[in-house]
Amino acid sequence: MDKHITTPITEEITADLHSGDYVYITGEIYVARDAAHKRMIEALDHGDELPIDIKDATIYYMGPSPAREGHPIGSAGPTTATRMDKYAPRLLDLGEKAMIGKGKRSKEVIDAIIRNKAVYFAAVGGAGALLSKCIKKSEVICYDDLGAEAIRKLYVEDFPAIVVIDKDGNNLYETAIKEFAK
Protein backbone atom coordinates (compact mmCIF):
# COMPACT_ATOMS: atom_id res chain seq x y z
CA MET A 1 0.00 0.00 0.00
CA ASP A 2 1.27 3.52 -0.82
CA LYS A 3 1.31 5.99 2.07
CA HIS A 4 2.32 9.64 2.19
CA ILE A 5 3.84 10.56 5.54
CA THR A 6 5.27 13.75 7.01
CA THR A 7 8.08 14.13 9.51
CA PRO A 8 8.49 14.11 12.41
CA ILE A 9 7.67 10.41 12.51
CA THR A 10 5.61 9.79 15.64
CA GLU A 11 4.23 6.61 17.20
CA GLU A 12 0.87 7.50 15.65
CA ILE A 13 2.52 7.32 12.22
CA THR A 14 4.49 4.12 12.90
CA ALA A 15 1.29 2.47 14.19
CA ASP A 16 -0.10 2.69 10.64
CA LEU A 17 3.03 1.47 8.83
CA HIS A 18 3.43 -2.18 7.95
CA SER A 19 6.27 -4.18 6.50
CA GLY A 20 6.00 -4.00 2.72
CA ASP A 21 4.25 -0.61 2.58
CA TYR A 22 5.55 1.91 0.07
CA VAL A 23 5.96 5.35 1.64
CA TYR A 24 6.64 8.84 0.35
CA ILE A 25 8.27 10.97 3.02
CA THR A 26 7.98 14.76 3.17
CA GLY A 27 9.70 16.96 5.75
CA GLU A 28 13.00 17.31 7.54
CA ILE A 29 15.28 14.31 7.94
CA TYR A 30 18.88 13.98 9.08
CA VAL A 31 21.75 12.35 7.24
CA ALA A 32 24.41 10.49 9.21
CA ARG A 33 26.74 7.60 8.45
CA ASP A 34 29.01 5.53 10.66
CA ALA A 35 31.61 8.22 11.50
CA ALA A 36 28.89 10.66 12.57
CA HIS A 37 27.08 7.95 14.55
CA LYS A 38 30.32 7.12 16.35
CA ARG A 39 30.78 10.79 17.29
CA MET A 40 27.21 11.10 18.54
CA ILE A 41 27.64 8.07 20.80
CA GLU A 42 31.00 9.40 22.03
CA ALA A 43 29.29 12.72 22.84
CA LEU A 44 26.64 10.88 24.85
CA ASP A 45 29.33 8.85 26.63
CA HIS A 46 30.99 12.13 27.68
CA GLY A 47 27.70 13.52 28.98
CA ASP A 48 27.27 15.96 26.09
CA GLU A 49 24.06 16.78 24.24
CA LEU A 50 23.43 15.35 20.80
CA PRO A 51 23.92 17.85 17.96
CA ILE A 52 20.45 17.01 16.60
CA ASP A 53 16.97 16.77 18.06
CA ILE A 54 16.61 12.99 18.16
CA LYS A 55 12.97 12.87 19.34
CA ASP A 56 10.83 11.44 16.53
CA ALA A 57 13.74 11.97 14.13
CA THR A 58 14.44 10.15 10.89
CA ILE A 59 18.07 9.42 10.04
CA TYR A 60 19.02 8.58 6.47
CA TYR A 61 22.21 6.54 6.12
CA MET A 62 23.78 8.31 3.15
CA GLY A 63 26.92 10.12 2.06
CA PRO A 64 26.14 12.44 -0.85
CA SER A 65 28.30 13.23 -3.81
CA PRO A 66 29.05 16.93 -4.43
CA ALA A 67 26.14 19.03 -5.63
CA ARG A 68 26.08 20.33 -9.19
CA GLU A 69 25.57 24.05 -9.60
CA GLY A 70 21.98 24.98 -8.85
CA HIS A 71 21.23 21.75 -6.96
CA PRO A 72 21.06 21.27 -3.18
CA ILE A 73 22.86 17.93 -3.24
CA GLY A 74 24.53 15.43 -5.55
CA SER A 75 23.69 11.75 -5.85
CA ALA A 76 22.10 10.66 -2.58
CA GLY A 77 21.74 6.88 -2.47
CA PRO A 78 21.51 4.84 0.73
CA THR A 79 24.45 3.16 2.38
CA THR A 80 24.49 -0.22 4.12
CA ALA A 81 22.64 0.01 7.42
CA THR A 82 24.56 -2.72 9.24
CA ARG A 83 27.46 -0.30 9.77
CA MET A 84 25.19 1.69 12.11
CA ASP A 85 23.88 -1.35 13.99
CA LYS A 86 26.18 -0.90 17.00
CA TYR A 87 24.93 2.69 17.46
CA ALA A 88 21.27 2.53 16.41
CA PRO A 89 19.73 0.89 19.52
CA ARG A 90 20.94 3.69 21.77
CA LEU A 91 19.61 6.39 19.46
CA LEU A 92 16.29 4.57 19.15
CA ASP A 93 16.07 4.37 22.94
CA LEU A 94 16.60 8.17 23.03
CA GLY A 95 13.67 8.78 20.70
CA GLU A 96 14.76 8.27 17.09
CA LYS A 97 11.73 6.85 15.25
CA ALA A 98 12.89 6.02 11.73
CA MET A 99 15.99 4.97 9.83
CA ILE A 100 16.50 4.85 6.08
CA GLY A 101 19.21 2.67 4.57
CA LYS A 102 19.69 -0.53 2.67
CA GLY A 103 20.26 -4.09 3.78
CA LYS A 104 19.51 -6.19 6.83
CA ARG A 105 19.56 -5.13 10.49
CA SER A 106 20.86 -6.98 13.54
CA LYS A 107 18.67 -8.62 16.17
CA GLU A 108 19.65 -5.85 18.60
CA VAL A 109 18.38 -3.16 16.22
CA ILE A 110 15.16 -5.08 15.53
CA ASP A 111 14.58 -5.48 19.28
CA ALA A 112 15.11 -1.71 19.72
CA ILE A 113 12.69 -1.00 16.85
CA ILE A 114 10.02 -3.09 18.61
CA ARG A 115 10.79 -1.64 22.05
CA ASN A 116 10.50 1.94 20.75
CA LYS A 117 7.72 1.45 18.17
CA ALA A 118 10.08 2.67 15.47
CA VAL A 119 10.52 1.70 11.82
CA TYR A 120 13.27 0.88 9.33
CA PHE A 121 12.82 1.99 5.73
CA ALA A 122 14.87 0.89 2.74
CA ALA A 123 15.64 3.23 -0.13
CA VAL A 124 16.62 1.83 -3.50
CA GLY A 125 20.36 1.32 -3.81
CA GLY A 126 21.79 2.49 -7.13
CA ALA A 127 19.12 5.16 -7.52
CA GLY A 128 20.99 8.01 -5.82
CA ALA A 129 20.60 10.43 -8.73
CA LEU A 130 16.86 9.82 -8.81
CA LEU A 131 16.50 10.09 -5.03
CA SER A 132 18.38 13.41 -5.03
CA LYS A 133 15.51 14.94 -7.02
CA CYS A 134 13.32 14.56 -3.91
CA ILE A 135 15.80 16.57 -1.81
CA LYS A 136 14.87 20.25 -1.90
CA LYS A 137 17.29 21.59 0.75
CA SER A 138 20.53 20.31 2.26
CA GLU A 139 22.50 21.89 5.08
CA VAL A 140 25.54 20.60 6.99
CA ILE A 141 24.70 21.11 10.65
CA CYS A 142 27.69 19.53 12.42
CA TYR A 143 30.86 17.49 12.07
CA ASP A 144 31.71 19.28 8.82
CA ASP A 145 35.27 17.98 9.15
CA LEU A 146 33.85 14.58 8.15
CA GLY A 147 33.12 15.81 4.62
CA ALA A 148 30.52 13.58 2.99
CA GLU A 149 29.94 11.94 6.40
CA ALA A 150 28.99 15.21 8.15
CA ILE A 151 25.53 15.37 9.68
CA ARG A 152 23.14 17.14 7.34
CA LYS A 153 19.58 18.29 7.65
CA LEU A 154 17.56 17.70 4.50
CA TYR A 155 14.14 18.83 3.43
CA VAL A 156 12.61 16.12 1.26
CA GLU A 157 9.39 15.94 -0.74
CA ASP A 158 7.81 12.58 -1.57
CA PHE A 159 11.04 10.70 -0.85
CA PRO A 160 10.29 7.07 -1.80
CA ALA A 161 11.06 4.21 0.57
CA ILE A 162 9.74 0.81 1.60
CA VAL A 163 8.89 -0.25 5.14
CA VAL A 164 11.25 -3.17 5.73
CA ILE A 165 10.88 -3.59 9.49
CA ASP A 166 7.75 -2.26 11.16
CA LYS A 167 7.09 -1.44 14.81
CA ASP A 168 6.13 -5.06 15.50
CA GLY A 169 9.36 -6.45 14.05
CA ASN A 170 7.78 -7.79 10.87
CA ASN A 171 10.66 -7.98 8.42
CA LEU A 172 10.11 -7.75 4.67
CA TYR A 173 13.47 -9.38 3.96
CA GLU A 174 12.33 -12.50 5.81
CA THR A 175 8.72 -12.62 4.61
CA ALA A 176 9.67 -11.98 0.98
CA ILE A 177 12.08 -14.93 1.01
CA LYS A 178 9.39 -17.20 2.48
CA GLU A 179 6.82 -15.97 -0.05
CA PHE A 180 9.21 -16.45 -2.96
CA ALA A 181 10.10 -19.97 -1.80
CA LYS A 182 6.47 -21.12 -2.03
Which residues are covered by each model-predicted region?
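Feature captures the catalytic cores and cofactor-binding loops of soluble hydro-lyases/lyases
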Residues: V31-A32, A36-F159
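Active-site/ligand-binding-proximal alpha/beta "capping" segment
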Residues: A88, V164-K182
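Short, structured beta-strand/loop micro-motifs enriched in basic residues and often containing a Trp
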Residues: M1-I9
